[in-house]
Amino acid sequence: MFRLKLLLPSAALLLALGANAQDRKAVMPEPSDAGQARLMKEVRHELVMLPYYNVFDNLSYRVSGSTVTLMGQVTRPTLKSDAGNVVKRLEGVTQVDNQIEVLPLSPNDDQIRYAVYRAVYGHTSLSTRYGYQAVPSIHIIVRNGNVTLEGVVANEADKNIANIQANGVSGVFSVTNNLRVEK
């Protein structure tokens, strides 16, 4: 009887401590806003530092907790896998959802890419402001003769000039202008 009296409170204490430990495991703290901002900055840095990332590729991402979703279009399959690999290695990333689209190989699309590049970055107001960066801020995506302009420009006039220049290229079926204006 004496043993049972000692055993009963000990068992109750163990059960309470075990339940408390499980509660702490179930409620994992979400990354802080500062941690989320740090992770977003690191993801961006790693993506723009990829060796073959250029003006004909468009990479974007979304960070949700410790999961990073990669989106966009690239001209090389290796760039898709490289982007996923560098983001996986970042501290704080537990999962990478790589939704990057590899654009189809097409000599016609390649000709259009270079012609649109010359038209957009050959314009004096665009070349001096955007053309001399390591990775220019206006990205030119060509899929089956359809051009999409992605990136950021300083003002509405630059957005319109880029659109007009791209529309003037022979062989282009349509131009989608997704350029954003800085605020």
Regions found by a protein language model. Name each.
Residues F2-P9, G18-K183:
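N-terminal targeting leaders
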Residues A12-L14:
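Repetitive helical segments and hydrophobic/amphipathic motifs
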